[in-house]
Each structure stands twice: as structure tokens, then as C-alpha cells.
């Protein structure tokens, strides 16, 4: 039985068990796969169309989830990231190009787009758009050709791990899309290498992230590519207190600004089935962040930094997501969504804020090493 030593109020003694995180992630992932049937490509594909913040302001944005086998990092020996379950929403086996394209075209046809509308398109692959083993090159190229033929796509947004951000792949893409804006979003999660590698099990370093960003910046300068970078920042990994989560997210935003990342997107933790974070949560060793913590982060960043910063509201107000109280959960979620478009601070008061402040202000006081509980993770 693997055990973790837990200090009072989420202050953890991690020596001796941090090395087990990767093994635990792999074990939980394997068990999750055994309990459920892989999805069909048709079940994986999805799309929606609404207003979103683009580099030219608020505009119509088409979101398309492409059917893929799943993230190569999660399907490999690493077991993937401790908070992510996207691979559970994939086929877990290769998909032929024709099937991918058929489903892409089906979803594209569901959203009639007026010729006068200038739109942004976000392509999600539940992994890395730039990894040819997840999304075959011929499928990728045909998708991009199709979008260019629409005549009114001004931005294309994709996601990728940094190791797939290669000059060869970007050359191939810009040969098709010309001067269209192309943003690569990378899940940096945190600027703290120890947190990213040992608590999130991300599998790449800050240097790897910097190299990907620098490559894109260099290609923009030398080849004129209309390239942008975005960093996803994860709010409150396991083995991190509420106060530490706030400080680390803000510090990560400052770091991204210092290396000229173009945009930020904060992703507060939600509890997904078949993940390490769910195991901690079920054992009483983890709780998603307060919504107040998320607001503190986004307000500070919008005050300090001159760069677009978004705050994801997935799971807000639910048992498995960021939560304040029943009085303010819904109001704050709606305010955050609206303020993502205006990039303004969120001003709101509720009685539950006192409880949040007490937890934050007493963070150091609660870091006692006297009473140690043993929490079995298996």
C-alpha cells in the first residue's frame, strides 16, 4: 500500500512519495481504461459557435473537437498529467484520415457562417494538433485548406506540447495558411519546474517551453509568420495549498510576460474521473480552488500585466469544481465569462469571502508538522 504523509490543511510532506506520482498516474489511468469502453470517432467529435475574445477584439469563434486516439503523453508509460482525463474522451486507437475529415466536415456544416463574418477557429485534438501521430499530416493539411477556402477565417488556434513545435511543421502549415494568424497554445501550467514535473507529471521543463516560444518568435521575425503563443496556467495542482496556488499562478503569469508570451489562459482545477487528482479528492486530501482565489489571480494579472488573460469557468459551482457558496457561484461565473471579453477586473462581494480570506491569511499558521495523517492512495 502506497501512503502519503499529509500535514494539516493541505500542507504535504512529499519526500518519499513524489517519485510514486508517475506510477500512480499510470495505474489509475490503466484502471480507468479497463472500466470504460473507448469512444467512437463520432462520439469524440464536437463543435459549437459563439463570441470569444480574439486578437482583433470580440468576434465569432468556431470551436471544433477533432477525433483523435488521444494525447501521446497520456497513452505512454508516463500515464499523463495528474489532473487530465481528456484521453478518456478519445478512441485510444488510430483513426484513418478519411474518418477524421468526414467528422470535421460534418461539424463544419452545422454552423452556417455568413460571408461577411470574420471568424476565429479553435481546433482541439485532446492532445497535440502538431503531433502527426495524433493527427495525421494529410488530415491536418486538408483541414487547413478547407478553412482557408472559406475565405473569412482570420485566426486559427491549436494546442500542442512544446516538443511538437517544430520549424518543419510550422513551415508546412504556413505554406497553406499564408498570413493568417496561427496561435499555438501550450500547457505550461506553472513556471515552477518542480511542481510541473513532480506534482503535475507534465514531462517537460520550463526550458522546453521557452525553446518552443523562442522558435515561434524567431520564425515570426525571420520568415514573417503570423505566429502567436498562449500559455495555459493550471490553478491549484495537488500538494499545493490555496495560498501557494494563488501565488504560483500569478508568478507564472509574470514569467510568461517576461518572455513575451502573447496570451494567457488560466485553468482552475476540476475533478475528472480516472485521475490522480480525483484519488486525492476522494481521500479528503484535495479540494478544488475557491472561486475567490481564481478572481484574485485574474484581477492581479489584469492589474499588473498588459497582455490578454482569460479565466476558464468549466465546473464552476459544481461539487467537483471551483466553488464559493450557493449565493454567489452562478453570479460570479457569469461575470467571469463577460469580463473575459472586456478584459476588466471582477468586482463582487459576498459573505463567504470572509471564510476564504481566513484560509488564505492563516496559510502559514496552519503549516504545522505536529499532527501527521496517513492517507492511503491505493
Q: What feature does the model see in each segment?
A:
Residues 111-113, 147-148, 172-181, 217-220, ...:
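Acidic (Asp/Glu)-rich catalytic clusters
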Residues 92, 96, 163-168, 238-243, ...:
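Acidic-and-aromatic substrate-binding clefts and catalytic sites of carbohydrate-active enzymes
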Residues 44, 53-102:
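Canonical Radical SAM [4Fe-4S] cluster-binding loop centered on the CxxxCxxC motif
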Residues 207-275, 294-313:
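Conserved C-terminal portion of the radical SAM core fold
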Residues 94-109, 135-146, 204-212, 245-253, ...:
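Well-ordered, non-membrane alpha-helical segments in soluble/globular domains
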Residues 133-141, 166-175, 243:
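Distinct, well-ordered alpha-helical segments
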Residues 85-107, 111-136, 150-166, 180-209, ...:
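Core AdoMet radical
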Residues 5, 10-11, 18-34, 43, ...:
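Auxiliary Fe-S-binding modules of radical SAM enzymes
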Amino acid at each position: 500500500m502506497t501512503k502519503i504523509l499529509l500535514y494539516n490543511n493541505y500542507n504535504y510532506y512529499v519526500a518519499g512519495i513524489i517519485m510514486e506520482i508517475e506510477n500512480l498516474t499510470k495505474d489509475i489511468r490503466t484502471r480507468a481504461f479497463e472500466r470504460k469502453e473507448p469512444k467512437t470517432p463520432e462520439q469524440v467529435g464536437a463543435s459549437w459557435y459563439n463570441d470569444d475574445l480574439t486578437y482583433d477584439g470580440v468576434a465569432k469563434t468556431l470551436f471544433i473537437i477533432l477525433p483523435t486516439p488521444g494525447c501521446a503523453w497520456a497513452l505512454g508509460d508516463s500515464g499523463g498529467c495528474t489532473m487530465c482525463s481528456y484521453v478518456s474522451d478519445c478512441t485510444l486507437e488510430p483513426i484513418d484520415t478519411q474518418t477524421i475529415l468526414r467528422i470535421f466536415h460534418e461539424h463544419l456544416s452545422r454552423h452556417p457562417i455568413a460571408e461577411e463574418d470574420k471568424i476565429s477557429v479553435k481546433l482541439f485534438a485532446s492532445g497535440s494538433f502538431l503531433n502527426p501521430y495524433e493527427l495525421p499530416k494529410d488530415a491536418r493539411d486538408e483541414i487547413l485548406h478547407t478553412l482557408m477556402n472559406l475565405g473569412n477565417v482570420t485566426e486559427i488556434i491549436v494546442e500542442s506540447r512544446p516538443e511538437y513545435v517544430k520549424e518543419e511543421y510550422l513551415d508546412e502549415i504556413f505554406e497553406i495558411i499564408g498570413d493568417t494568424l496561427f496561435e499555438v497554445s501550450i500547457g505550461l501550467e506553472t513556471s515552477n519546474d518542480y511542481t510541473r514535473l513532480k506534482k503535475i507529471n507534465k514531462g517537460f521543463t520550463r526550458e522546453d517551453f521557452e525553446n518552443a516560444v523562442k522558435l515561434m518568435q524567431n520564425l515570426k521575425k525571420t520568415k514573417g509568420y503570423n505566429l502567436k503563443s498562449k500559455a495555459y496556467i493550471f490553478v491549484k495542482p495537488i500538494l499545493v495549498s490555496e495560498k501557494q496556488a494563488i501565488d504560483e499562478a500569478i508568478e507564472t503569469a509574470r514569467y510568461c510576460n517576461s518572455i513575451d508570451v502573447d496570451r494567457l489562459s488560466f485553468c482552475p482545477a476540476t475533478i475528472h474521473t480516472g485521475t490522480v487528482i480525483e484519488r486525492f479528492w476522494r481521500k479528503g486530501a484535495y479540494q478544488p480552488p475557491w472561486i475567490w482565489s481564481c478572481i484574485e489571480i485574474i484581477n492581479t494579472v489584469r492589474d499588473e500585466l498588459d497582455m490578454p488573460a482569460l479565466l476558464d469557468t468549466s465546473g464552476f459551482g459544481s461539487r467537483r469544481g471551483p466553488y464559493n457558496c450557493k449565493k454567489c457561484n452562478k453570479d460570479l461565473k457569469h461575470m467571469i465569462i463577460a469580463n473575459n471579453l472586456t478584459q476588466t477586473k471582477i468586482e463582487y462581494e459576498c459573505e463567504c469571502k470572509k471564510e476564504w480570506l481566513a484560509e488564505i491569511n492563516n496559510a502559514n499558521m496552519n503549516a504545522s508538522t505536529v499532527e501527521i495523517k496517513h492517507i492511503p492512495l491505493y
